[in-house]
Amino acid sequence: MAASRLPPATLTLKQFMRRQQVLLLYRKILRAIKQIPSDSDRKYLQDWAREEFKRNKSATEEDTIRMMITQGNMQLKELERTLALAKS
């Protein structure tokens, strides 16, 4: 029997799309954090974001992942609003 080239745990289309949403959110959060003027605050928030995503990396339940994405988007919007107010 020939060995399969697919990895043993191939993602379904739904899982793949959800993973892309999570990665996009992570990148957006890190880009927003780069706009923070204070080095110490920027470092703190970068560490916080990394730890939150690492902590939730093993989540597999669809509803839980959707809820975390929604919360992450709300936190991103709040950060963007705060940065906009700080610049004005």
Swiss-Prot record:
GO cellular component, one term: mitochondrion
Transit peptide: 1-19
Localization (cell): Mitochondrion
Top-level taxon: Eukaryota
CDD domains: Complex1_LYR_LYRM2
GO biological process: mitochondrial respiratory chain complex I assembly
Pfam family, any one: Complex1_LYR
Chief location of this protein within or outside the cell: mitochondrion
Assigned keywords, A-Z: Mitochondrion, Transit peptide
Span of the signal peptide: none
The family this protein is said to belong to: Belongs to the complex I LYR family.
Function: Involved in efficient integration of the N-module into mitochondrial respiratory chain complex I.
Name of protein: LYR motif-containing protein 2
